[in-house]
Amino acid sequence: ILASSSNYRQEIFNKLALNYESISPNIDESSLLSEAAEDLVARLALTKAKAAAVILSARAEATSSVVNKSTAHKESYLIVGSDQVAVIDGKIVTKPHNHSNAFKQLRHASGRRVTFLTSLCLYNTYTGSHQLTVVPYTVNFLPLTDAQIENYLMKEQPYD
């Protein structure tokens, strides 16, 4: 089970030819007060996986018959939750959501070092156990002209 409605994450699963179901966890992805970026992505990956588990449990409960209720919660799933943030100069960069914000963010990243933190959580619904990792990688942006930024944004439209 993929605990995400992200087209990007679904594309990865599709490229891997995985047989999966995508469930939108529909959680609040806001950072907590003074929460470090690493802690944020780890918390969100686990929260997404657990939210998907709750959705699956509710679905099983709703579709099971009275006779079958005792087995409704015995199905087991492996749920993948993930999150990613970018960090520039120690500050978390949020999703731009529109062209103007994306342009400002790329202009700010131009010529700078940007660290991307990606979390991955594998949650086992049968045992309630999980494995979680956060992987950082750093990208050194070359200086970008406004025209280069515009061309990229018009082609890719990376707003979500």
Model feature map: region roles:
Residues 1-18:
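N-terminal beta1-alpha1 ligand-phosphate binding loop
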Residues 2, 33-34, 40:
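Accessory recognition modules or surfaces
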Residues 5, 25, 125:
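Cofactor-binding loop segments of dinucleotide-utilizing enzymes, especially the Rossmann-like FAD-
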Residues 14, 38-60, 64-160:
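Anionic-ligand binding patches
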Residues 21-30:
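A short beta-strand-loop structural module common to alpha/beta enzyme folds
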Residues 29-33, 88-90:
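A short acidic, helix-capping loop that chelates divalent metal ions and anchors anionic groups
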